[in-house]
C-alpha cells in the first residue's frame, strides 16, 4: 500500500515530509531482513501500524517544544516520525548497537533530524526533555522508574500503550505526582 492511500485523510504533511517518511519505511523494510526491527507480520500494514500510530502523537506536542526524548527507540517509532513532523530537537535512546546504526542510517539517508544515543536510558545524563516518548518498551511503572533521572516537574510523557493501558494506569493510582490522561 502506498503512503497516500494508507494515510488518506489521516495526516496532512508536505510532499517533502511524506517523501522522507516513505524513504524511512523503505529502510525499515530493507533492514528488517538483517535486524529484527518490527514484527514481520506488521510490515504489510507499516503505514498504519507504525507510521500513523506514531504520528497520532504529533498533535499532543505543543508548538515551541524544545526537546523530545524517545526511549527504547528500536526501529524509531515514534521518535523518528515525530522528528519528521514536529519542530523539536529529538533524542533517540537505543541500547542495541545494530538498531542504533539503523537509526543513524535513517537520519543520514532521509534528512530527518535527530540525535542517537547508543546506550541504556539509565546511563544517559539528564538532557532536559520537555516530552518523553516510548512505545512497546515496558509497563508504565517500569518506564517511570527507568526515566526517573530524566523527569522534572512539567515533563510530559507520551507513552503508546496497548490493551493493558488502563490496568497500567490504575497501578499508578498511588502516585500523586502524576497527572494521568488516556487518549484513545
Q: Locations of the language-model features?
A:
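Class I SAM-dependent transferase core
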Residues: 1-69, 98-113
